[in-house]
Amino acid sequence: MNSTSNLIEQVIEAWQNMQAKTPLVQCITNSVAANYTANVLLASGASPAMIDNPYEAESFTKISSALSINLGTPTSEQMQAMQISAKTAQLNNVPWVLDPVGYGPILAWRSQMTDELLQFKPSVIRGNASEISTLAGNQVQSKGVDSTLSSDQAYQQAFSLLTHASCIAISGESDYILSNEVDAVIQVNGGSPLQPKITATGCALGALIAAYSAVTTPTIAALSAHIHFAIAGKLAANQAQTMGSFSSIFMDYIHMLDANLIEQYADVKLLNKQA
């Protein structure tokens, strides 16, 4: 059984490995999030590549350290690239993260494409509470791509998704990580209410999980990324209460995170699984 202290030690090791290895992360992401996502990865110590052309997808995925697929603003051409890259990642043991943005009956086309991508066994599925709950087969009132469900409600409904991925990460006021590797639900606290008001923070979080997955297991990757964001959000909120200032300082702390800050501020709890 993992203890919280042991998990935090593994997070510190993952952070150190990412700084040492600078993993190359292929991001097939949405037009709103691409720039912010790339900057978050650079600030974190990874190397982003926004390769979403189906004619280049296979060759680039083969040389990538990890793959992040985000369905925020999908085009037909992007969907082709997603399918090619996901299949290539599975065949070449490249860890990959699926972010099913907006999954649900209102956005039926992308949701069907998401269902098809599950066959390629993502390492981690990451989303907000509504997306994850709906993906798990529950009926949830939709509000575009924003969550109408709390994360503590959603994690109870998401265990079935562990047949598709090693790890499920649900973001919210508290974040929850379900895993085939750890016999508990991992709860991560911290962050700031201003984070979801900044465009693309959730999308960038998915890409950061992918970056960490290049240097550690899927569960520790998800935990590391969520802790990274939670600490940066908490410390930024101590210095700024308005969105513009918070956004800038948040990015600074994404860059300035180190082992001492992780050890000092990581707030992790282990909960019993209740499938």
From Swiss-Prot:
Substrate binds at M50, A200. Keywords: ATP-binding, Kinase, Magnesium, Metal-binding, Nucleotide-binding, Thiamine biosynthesis, Transferase. GO terms for molecular function: ATP binding; hydroxyethylthiazole kinase activity; magnesium ion binding. Pfam families: HK. Belongs to the Thz kinase family. ATP binds at R126, S171. It is an enzyme of class 2 (transferase). This is Hydroxyethylthiazole kinase. Catalyzes the phosphorylation of the hydroxyl group of 4-methyl-5-beta-hydroxyethylthiazole (THZ). Its EC number is 2.7.1.50. The keyword Transmembrane does not apply. InterPro entries: Hyethyz_kinase, Ribokinase-like. The keyword Disulfide bond does not apply. Transmembrane segments: none annotated. Pathway: Cofactor biosynthesis; thiamine diphosphate biosynthesis; 4-methyl-5-(2-phosphoethyl)-thiazole from 5-(2-hydroxyethyl)-4-methylthiazole: step 1/1. One of its GO terms (biological process) is thiamine biosynthetic process. The gene is thiM. It catalyses: 5-(2-hydroxyethyl)-4-methylthiazole + ATP = 4-methyl-5-(2-phosphooxyethyl)-thiazole + ADP + H(+). Its cofactor is Mg(2+).
